[in-house]
């Protein structure tokens, strides 16, 4: 089997443990557990985390995979007794968890660098609406998502729109992002009639600097006082930089 596209789409009551499946040759999981209609999906792998052991190394698209699946919340990142999904070949994450209102797992271990900017199609899809209306999502409360390699991303429009995302993403390197409308809007509750309220954007301090890569250089001063010398009103400090530095005389 090389495609599982729309396999359980609109199978609203399906909820069995299929974590033992061999998915190593599958290239498309597009809309696999998508609601596909007005009703929401209830798939949660029978309550088992085994789905986190799937071999997804060949998958190229997870477009709309869990769209409208209001029950799914199993670990898909490494740790927690599962190996975690290998998504390094995935080029499209668009709307993967859109409307997956319970999903809140730590997927910071994912290698998402497979997205590309050399194709209009891949670029337009990319991470667009990946977690849109996934109201519980905050990467399981972990800041590990800050380690995602986003250099290939060019569309993050509504990526975290109406979520609980409050992790610091300011370290993301996003030199190619061209579409970022409503990137992250934090969800804080509903009125009695179900209308969304109290929506606030992710703070500027936690938002990536669009079109740029932040400097990751750090400076560590020695803790050995013998390395720090004061002579004739001059202070000599011994320091270590995390990156190669080219000294510039002043």
Which stretches of residues belong to each language-model region?
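Negatively charged
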Residues: 1-215
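Non-catalytic beta-sheet/beta-sandwich ligand-binding modules that flank or precede catalytic cores
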Residues: 214-250
């Amino acid at each position: 089997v090389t495609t599982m596209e729309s396999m359980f789409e609109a199978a609203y009551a399906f909820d069995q443990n299929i974590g033992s499946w061999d998915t190593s040759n599958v290239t498309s999981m597009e809309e696999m557990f998508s609601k596909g209609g007005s009703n929401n999906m209830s798939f949660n792998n029978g309550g088992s985390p085994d789905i986190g052991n799937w071999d997804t190394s060949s998958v190229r698209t997870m477009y709309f995979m869990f769209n409208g699946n209001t029950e799914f919340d199993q670990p898909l990142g490494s740790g927690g007794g599962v190996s975690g999904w290998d998504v390094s070949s995935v080029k499209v994450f668009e709307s993967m968890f859109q409307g997956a209102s319970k999903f809140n797992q730590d997927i910071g271990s994912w290698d998402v660098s497979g997205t590309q900017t050399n194709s209009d199609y891949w670029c337009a899809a990319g991470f667009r609406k990946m977690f849109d209306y996934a109201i519980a999502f905050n990467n399981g409360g972990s800041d590990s998502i800050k380690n995602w390699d986003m250099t290939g991303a060019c569309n993050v429009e509504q990526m975290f729109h109406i979520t609980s995302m409050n992790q610091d993403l300011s370290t993301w390197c996003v030199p190619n992002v061209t579409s970022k409308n409503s990137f992250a809007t934090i969800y804080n509750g509903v009125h009695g009639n179900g209308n969304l309220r109290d929506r606030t954007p992710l703070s500027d301090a936690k938002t990536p600097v669009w079109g740029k890569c932040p400097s990751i250089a750090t400076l560590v001063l020695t803790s050995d006082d013998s390395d720090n010398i004061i002579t004739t009103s001059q202070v000599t400090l011994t320091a270590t930089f995390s990156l190669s530095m080219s000294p510039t005389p002043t």
